[in-house]
UniProtKB/Swiss-Prot annotation:
Keywords: Carbohydrate metabolism, Isomerase, NADP. SUPFAM superfamilies: NAD(P)-binding Rossmann-fold domains. NADP(+) binds at residues 10-11, 31-32, 38, 53, 75-79, 92, 144, 170, 178. Disulfide bonds: none annotated. It catalyses: ADP-D-glycero-beta-D-manno-heptose = ADP-L-glycero-beta-D-manno-heptose. This is ADP-L-glycero-D-manno-heptose-6-epimerase. Homopentamer. Binds 1 NADP(+) per subunit. Catalyzes the interconversion between ADP-D-glycero-beta-D-manno-heptose and ADP-L-glycero-beta-D-manno-heptose via an epimerization at carbon 6 of the heptose.
């Protein structure tokens, strides 16, 4: 059995889909369906069982055996970069992850987990998986950074696989439940379909991020499980493309609309990553050599998925 925490969420459900595509259905999805809208991410997928996050954590903390576990993909977390409840964030993203990690280490279970490019904070170059480059801007980024630091202490002594992925700006199918935290491509598509002008912040041609398609993210996760490699790796494309490029690809698909530029909100000033670009040196050195979709390729594929019933 493979366990996917956050399996009804964005990246988790895409990992479940990637496993299904390989014929793997003996999957336990762990999630919190308090937001009932997330169930739609699982409707077309095949899993063996579902467990609530709190029930799962109780079993993990009590050391209960959950059966023959091949691996745990730990995608479950609070991923809101605007959430400032530090206790909630640390409980969800740090303590929970530590409990799961030790459960896996004691049983020799591969543990593959979601870290984040938010660990790098506001830097504009050298996004390298090393302490001197890490300075998160928000408590979400700090919770991810602190767990990476915890893992670094354990990695040299670990007898089973531990791998963390620093996700950059992931976009693609199954993110609709994320609301304001969904990708720019998702929001632009919604605005166009509602007959509105798609909106970007002023200066969006200068805001550049490493936008990575979620299908590529899932593929990297599965490759690492098969390879058995351990470590903490950036997971982006290695390219920085502008929000304007995302909008251009969205408009090109829809063949209509023009961008309305809106003022940059004061509340985000100083807490906003204006530039991200994954350094893929470690990922490539680990042996992952497949290409990543460009914004034009990924957004076009995503638009086709979003508008498949239109």
């Amino acid at each position: 059995m493979i366990i996917v925490t956050g399996g009804a969420g964005f990246i988790g459900s895409n990992i479940v889909k990637a496993l299904n595509d390989k014929g793997i259905t003996d999957i336990l999805v762990v999630d919190n369906l308090k937001d009932g809208t997330k169930f739609v991410n699982l409707v077309d997928l095949n899993i063996a069982d579902y467990m609530d996050k709190e029930d799962f954590l109780i079993q993990i903390m009590s050391g209960e055996e959950l059966g023959d576990i091949e691996a745990i993909f730990h995608e479950g977390a609070c991923s809101s970069t605007t959430e400032w409840d530090g206790k909630y964030m640390m409980d969800n993203n740090y303590q929970y992850s530590k409990e799961l990690l030790h459960y896996c280490l004691e049983r020799g279970i591969p543990f593959l987990y979601a870290s984040s490019a938010a660990t790098y904070g506001g830097r504009t170059s050298d996004f390298i998986e090393s302490r001197e480059y890490e300075k998160p801007l928000n408590v979400y980024g700090y919770s991810k950074f602190l767990f990476d630091e915890y893992v670094r202490q354990i990695l040299p002594e670990a007898n089973s696989q531990i791998v963390g992925f620093r996700y950059f700006n992931v976009y693609g199918p199954r993110e609709g439940h994320k609301g304001s935290m969904a990708s720019v491509a998702f929001h632009l598509n919604t605005q166009l379909n509602n007959g509105e002008s798609p909106k970007l912040f002023e200066g969006s041609e200068n805001f550049k991020r490493d936008f990575v398609y979620v299908g590529d993210v899932a593929a990297v996760n599965l490759w690492f499980l098969e390879s058995g490699k351990s470590g903490i790796f950036n997971l982006g494309t290695g390219r920085a493309e502008s929000f304007q490029a995302v909008a251009d690809a969205t408009l090109a698909y829809h063949k209509k609309g023009s961008i309305e530029y809106i003022p940059f909100p004061d509340k985000l000033k100083g807490r906003y990553q204006a530039f991200t670009q994954a350094d893929l040196t470690n990922l490539r050195n680990a042996g992952y050599d497949k290409p990543f979709k460009t914004v034009a390729e990924g957004v076009t594929e995503y638009m086709a998925w979003l508008n498949r019933d239109a």
